[in-house]
Design a protein with these regions (language model features):
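Hydrolases whose catalytic domains are alpha/beta-hydrolase-1, hotdog thioesterase
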Residues: 99-103, 129
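Conserved acidic catalytic loop of the alpha/beta-hydrolase fold
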Residues: 74-88
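Gly/Ala-rich beta-loop-alpha elbow adjacent to hydrolase catalytic centers
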Residues: 91-100
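Active-site nucleophile loop of the alpha/beta-hydrolase fold
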Residues: 59, 117-129, 163, 186
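The feature captures the conserved acid-bearing segment of alpha/beta-hydrolase catalytic domains
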Residues: 125-178
Length: 206
């Protein structure tokens, strides 16, 4: 589905659709600081079972080197273009959710027109486009604000998911006709109920 050269230059994970299932939709999933971990794998299984292949971007590896929003946006565009799917779901967890708005807002209109949904799982108010080991220990007060970037996405359907015990989540602050906010039981890791997260994303597809 993707040219091998893209795998050579970006830390990508390809999860093919389940045998016998097909869809015209690609899911691009940007992971959190833990890399391609249990939450990303668990949610992706729901997508692939419904015929949607997943291309995962390992945020731990990708943002180990500092990136500009323009850099990240161009790489996202390359991923979407190389897969040749007419419709796309963008999903991100934690840092992946934090960076997606800035990546999307810099994409061409023709690319953005493909998006069925932008699913943000556990986004925080700020993001820095470089990983620091200290980020594993506490939330960062550095970086750029996520909400102003998100407010630029007026034509996208946004789904924001947060755990009710996640005090750092941006979701409760969001308002807008194109934004759905869902607060679930649990913390930033959603109590490990990843299948339910995947099902909720599917329910919000347009």
């Amino acid at each position: 589905m993707i040219l091998n050269v893209l795998f050579a230059v970006l830390p990508l994970v390809h999860v093919p659709a389940a045998a016998g299932a097909s869809s015209d939709t690609l899911v691009v999933f940007v992971s959190g600081d833990g890399g391609w971990a249990a939450i990303d794998k668990g949610i992706s299984r729901v997508f692939t079972a419904n015929g949607m292949p997943v291309v995962g971007l390992d945020a731990l590896k990708y943002f180990w080197t500092r990136r500009t929003p323009g850099d990240a946006s161009r790489d996202l565009e390359r991923i979407i273009d190389e897969t040749h799917k007419p419709r796309v779901v963008l999903a991100g967890y934690s840092r992946g959710a934090d960076v997606l708005p800035a990546m999307i807002s810099r994409l061409p209109a023709a690319t953005r027109a493909k998006f069925r949904l932008v699913a943000l799982l556990g986004p925080s108010p700020r993001v820095e486009l470089e990983f620091h080991v200290a980020d594993w220990l506490h939330s960062s007060s550095r970086g750029v604000l996520v909400k102003p970037e998100l407010e630029k996405l007026t034509s996208e359907h946004i789904l924001c998911l947060a755990g009710e015990d996640d005090r750092d989540s941006l979701c409760p602050q969001l308002r807008g006709a194109n934004i759905d906010v869902v607060i679930l039981k649990g913390s930033h890791h959603f109590d490990g109920n990843y299948e339910r997260l995947g099902r909720i994303v599917l329910e919000h597809l347009k």
